[in-house]
């Protein structure tokens, strides 16, 4: 009420069916939204998958991927897709690709200003922008965020151009 807020959304790194968590949250008067049918119902996904890479080599990590993922990763590298760390200025290109992705896949896109504020507040310690290029043209991007010893793939975007190069892998 103090800030005229309508909704407070929290997404703790806790299993959603954790009884202790659910009891605490509901006893505090909050509601738990479990009814999102798919990604199109939300602006951010409700569930995440986790991959423990601690102490593993790149080869061991790759071996844990589905065969088709390994193929696509190697194909992108072989075809000349290059991944570079982006700057705040590269957010415009990322956002343009994100709009293209949202239009193609039917999900809501946050405005450029959201990504700029996120970058200003989190980069470089807790956020990166990684962009994939083909012939120096940005064709894909990802925003991972870091906290403690964990990384979350928060946003990803891929252009309709050069999709056959598998830049999002």
Show the residue positions of the predicted features.
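Conserved acetyl-CoA-binding loop-helix of GNAT-fold acetyltransferases
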Residues: 1, 163-169
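Conserved GNAT acetyl-CoA-binding A-motif
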Residues: 3-14
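A conserved beta-strand-loop-helix scaffold within acyl/acetyltransferase catalytic domains
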Residues: 12-17, 27-164
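Extracellular disulfide-rich cysteine clusters
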Residues: 19-22
């Amino acid at each position: 009420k103090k800030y005229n807020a309508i909704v407070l959304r929290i997404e703790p790194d806790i299993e959603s069916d954790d009884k202790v968590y659910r009891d605490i949250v509901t006893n505090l008067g909050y509601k738990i939204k479990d009814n999102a049918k798919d990604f199109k119902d939300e602006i951010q996904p409700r569930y995440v998958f986790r991959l423990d890479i601690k102490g593993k080599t790149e080869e061991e990590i790759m071996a844990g991927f589905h065969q088709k993922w390994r193929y696509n990763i190697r194909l992108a590298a072989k075809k000349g897709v290059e991944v570079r760390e982006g700057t705040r200025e590269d957010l415009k290109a990322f956002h343009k690709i994100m709009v293209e992705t949202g239009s193609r896949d039917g999900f809501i896109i946050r405005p450029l200003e959201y990504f700029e504020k996120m970058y200003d507040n989190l980069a470089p310690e807790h956020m990166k922008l990684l962009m994939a290029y083909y012939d120096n043209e940005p064709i894909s991007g990802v925003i991972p965020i870091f906290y403690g010893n964990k990384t979350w793939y928060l946003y990803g975007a891929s252009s309709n151009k050069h999709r056959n190069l598998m830049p999002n892998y």
